[in-house]
């Protein structure tokens, strides 16, 4: 997995996690179940304090916030990662430049501020559309688009 910028969403891990969350949400799966399933998969591969998981928690936090409200456990974990400097320390291990670290810290604070306020409306699920097609023999088929 890689990062291509200092922004919160500028990593493969973040994008993969966020997209998976939204796909499951759009299928009607409960937010808490999606979060639990995604975390379980990542925790099979990485230790809970591994820096790779920071982007997983950030993506889950953003997705939960967007879909109606961030859970207390995810918010507290994100807050801990940011306030205790864990993400910046992880980026230092990755040999980030001082300029990148400063920009990352600013991005982290902006992100934390944004998820700290409640969102007025939750994202609506986008269920797959179903259309009925008829062939020449007048049999009906259901198709998902």
Q: Which residues are covered by each model-predicted region?
A:
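Amphipathic alpha-helical elements of HEAT/ARM-like alpha-solenoid repeat scaffolds that form extended
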Residues: 2, 16-17, 51-66, 98, ...
């Amino acid at each position: 997995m890689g990062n291509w910028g200092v922004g919160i969403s500028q990593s493969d891990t973040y994008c993969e996690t966020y997209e998976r969350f939204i796909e499951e949400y759009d299928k009607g799966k409960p937010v808490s179940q999606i979060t639990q399933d995604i975390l379980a998969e990542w925790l099979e591969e990485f230790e809970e304090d591994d820096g790779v998981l920071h982007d997983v928690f950030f993506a889950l936090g953003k997705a939960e916030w967007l879909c109606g409200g961030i859970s207390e456990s995810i918010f507290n974990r994100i807050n801990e990662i940011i306030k205790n400097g864990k993400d910046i320390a992880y980026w230092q291990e990755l040999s980030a430049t001082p300029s990148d670290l400063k920009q990352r810290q600013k991005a982290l604070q902006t992100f934390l501020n944004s998820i700290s306020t409640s969102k007025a409306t939750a994202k609506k699920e986008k269920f797959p559309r179903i259309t009925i097609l008829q062939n020449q023999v007048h049999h009906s088929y259901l198709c998902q688009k």
